[in-house]
Swiss-Prot record:
Gene Ontology molecular functions: rRNA binding; structural constituent of ribosome
InterPro entries hit by this protein: Ribosomal_uS15, Ribosomal_uS15_bac-type, uS15_NS1_RNA-bd_sf
Protein name: Small ribosomal subunit protein uS15
SMART domains tied to this protein: Ribosomal_S15
Top-level taxon of origin: Bacteria
SUPFAM superfamilies: S15/NS1 RNA-binding domain
Subunit annotation: Part of the 30S ribosomal subunit. Forms a bridge to the 50S subunit in the 70S ribosome, contacting the 23S rRNA.
Keyword list, A-Z: Ribonucleoprotein, Ribosomal protein, RNA-binding, rRNA-binding
Organism: Nitratidesulfovibrio vulgaris (strain DSM 19637 / Miyazaki F) (Desulfovibrio vulgaris)
GO cellular component, one term: cytosolic small ribosomal subunit
Pfam entry (one): Ribosomal_S15
Free-text function comment from the UniProt entry: One of the primary rRNA binding proteins, it binds directly to 16S rRNA where it helps nucleate assembly of the platform of the 30S subunit by binding and bridging several RNA helices of the 16S rRNA.
Length: 89
């Protein structure tokens, strides 16, 4: 269930604004989205795993807050990220 180091590094490389960038909202949202997708697949087979579902809901809330922040700061970056990740907003 834990994200592979290579997966995480590739996601960071794609969304980073500069070398060593791990904290920008784009990188954080991309990592949360990958983790959310991973957990969604987990719940298809483990329907009664309510403890992990709580963690999933926290991740979704954190991603929503980061997207709200990014939208308030720079709408163009927000729209580009939404399109790149394929989120519904």
């Amino acid at each position: 269930m834990v994200m592979d180091v290579d997966q995480k590094k590739s996601i960071i490389d794609v969304h980073a604004k500069h070398e060593g960038d791990t904290g920008s909202p784009e990188v954080q949202v991309a990592l949360l989205t990958a983790r959310i997708e991973q957990l969604t697949g987990h719940f298809k087979t483990h329907k009664k795993d309510f403890h992990s579902r709580t963690g999933l809901l926290k991740m979704v809330g954190q991603r929503r807050k980061l997207l709200k922040y990014l939208k308030a700061k720079d709408v163009q970056r927000y729209r580009a990220l939404i399109e790149k990740l394929g989120l519904r907003k």
